[in-house]
Curated annotation (Swiss-Prot):
The keyword Flavoprotein applies. Quinone reductase that provides resistance to thiol-specific stress caused by electrophilic quinones. Also exhibits azoreductase activity. Catalyzes the reductive cleavage of the azo bond in aromatic azo compounds to the corresponding amines. The gene is azoR1. Binds 1 FMN per subunit. InterPro entries: Flavodoxin_fold, Flavoprotein-like_sf, FMN-dep_NADH:Q_OxRdtase_AzoR1, NADH:quinone_OxRdtase_FMN_depd. Belongs to the azoreductase type 1 family. SUPFAM superfamilies: Flavoproteins. Pfam families: Flavodoxin_2 (PF02525). Keywords: Flavoprotein, FMN, NAD, Oxidoreductase. This is FMN-dependent NADH:quinone oxidoreductase 1. The keyword NAD applies. Its cofactor is FMN.
Length: 221
C-alpha cells in the first residue's frame, strides 16, 4: 500500500487555520480518488518533535547508533528512537503534503526541527568527503507544500518573499524528490479577500494538483 504523509504545522486548531483547512480538504479528496493510499498524519505543533542535540550525534554529525547509542541514558535513547521513527516513516512514504502558515517569510520553527530529524546520512542523503546526494530517488515521490499568508505577493516579488517555499523546494530536491508542487493560500488578512475567499480559491486548485501528485509504480533499478 502506498503512503500519503500529511504534516500540518500550526498551533491553531484546524477550524481556525487556513493552511490546515486547505490541507484537510486536499488529503480527503486525494484519498477518495486514490483509496490505495494509507493516510499518515502529524500535527507537529501538537506532537513531540525532538530538537537535535550534540548528545545524539557521533563525531561525523550522524545520529548515533551501535555502541554510541548503548551509552546514552534511557531518556536520550527514547529521543533518538523518536528521531529515527520520524525519518524511517518519511522514507517509507510516497506522497508528502505539508501545510503551514508563512512566518517571517519562512515557516514555523517546528517544521525546521522536523526536517532536521528526517535529513539523515545513509537514510535520506548520502554524504561523502566530496559531495552529498539524495537517496530518495529510489522510487517516484511527490511533495505538495500548502502555504497560507496574510498578504498577496505578485510573481515579480514572490521569489523575494516566499523563502519558505524556496527552501522546501531546494531541500526536497536535494534529497532526491523531484516532483514538487505548491499551493499558496494568499490574502487571508486582506480586506477584499479574507480567509474564506482565500480558502475557496485554493479549493478550486485541488483537483488539478491531485492529478499531478499521484505517483506511478516505478522503482529505480
Amino acid at each position: 500500500m502506498k503512503k500519503l504523509l500529511y504534516i500540518s504545522v500550526n498551533t491553531k486548531p484546524e477550524g481556525m487555520s487556513a493552511s490546515k483547512t486547505v490541507g484537510r480538504e486536499f488529503v480527503d479528496r486525494f484519498v477518495q480518488n486514490y483509496p490505495e493510499y494509507q493516510l499518515i498524519e502529524h500535527d507537529i505543533c501538537n506532537e513531540y518533535i525532538p530538537e537535535l542535540d550534540h548528545r545524539f550525534l557521533n563525531d561525523n554529525g550522524d545520529i548515533v547508533s551501535g555502541n554510541d547509542y548503548n551509552l546514552l541514558s534511557d531518556n536520550d535513547k527514547k529521543i533518538v528512537d523518536r528521531i529515527n521513527d520520524l525519518c524511517n516513516e518519511f522514507v517509507s512514504a510516497d506522497v508528502y503534503v505539508i501545510a503551514y502558515p508563512m512566518w517571517s517569510s519562512l515557516f514555523p520553527p517546528r517544521l525546521k526541527m522536523y526536517i532536521d530529524c528526517i535529513v539523515q546520512n545513509g537514510k535520506t542523503i548520502k554524504i561523502s568527503e566530496d559531495e552529498s546526494s539524495g537517496l530518495l530517488s529510489d522510487k517516484e515521490r511527490s511533495v505538495l507544500c500548502i502555504q497560507s499568508s496574510g498578504g498577496v505577493y505578485p510573481k515579480i516579488i514572490s521569489w523575494k518573499i516566499n523563502h519558505g517555499i524556496n527552501y522546501l523546494h531546494d531541500i526536497f530536491r536535494h534529497l532526491g524528490i523531484k516532483k514538487f508542487e505548491k499551493l499558496l493560500v494568499e490574502g487571508v488578512d486582506v480586506q477584499d479577500i479574507g480567509k474564506e475567499k482565500a480558502v475557496e480559491k485554493a479549493f478550486d486548485e485541488i483537483d488539478e494538483l491531485i492529478d499531478k501528485m499521484q505517483v506511478r509504480d516505478f522503482v529505480k533499478q
